[in-house]
């Protein structure tokens, strides 16, 4: 169990259960997103920085007429830019246990850099830098090997609404948030498709 998993476990224990911890995390996000006194979640309109987590509305994808379903409220771990579009892993599409495994592994790998940025920025989401090496090209082998690549999506910057960036210091809260808004399907259908792919490719 890595550092992030331990922090999440502590939150669950403190809340006396996973369901309550998830509910409290959603309440935390909504309160923080609308607060001017807490900079751990801030408005953000620029291109995504690799390694940072963003939450936004995505109501009308350019290719929506050809999509079976899509998430209108993605929670995205950015992989940087690709062909002028934002690219990242939509954490909403990954079943909870697998999501924790993914975030824990990434946090452990970049822990030194993340901790330095949190201390330097004092938990201010906008001032924290990204992780330059956390790009699709660099992590593609890992994503393909584990199956997490099935949750990678691209987003047109101009179609994003109400975009917010979350501080690394709050990844423990983000891991507990369920903010999906699936159009054209249910979250269980999304979990089924993504979950099977991850299980199939897990080694």
Predicted regions and their residues:
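Mixed-charge, Lys/Arg-rich low-complexity intrinsically disordered regions
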Residues: 2-54
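Short aromatic-glycine-(Arg/Gly/Cys) micro-motifs in beta-strand/loop hairpins
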Residues: 48-50, 63-66
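Intrinsically disordered, low-complexity, charged/polar segments
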Residues: 94-203
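Short, solvent-exposed secondary-structure boundary/capping segments
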Residues: 84-93
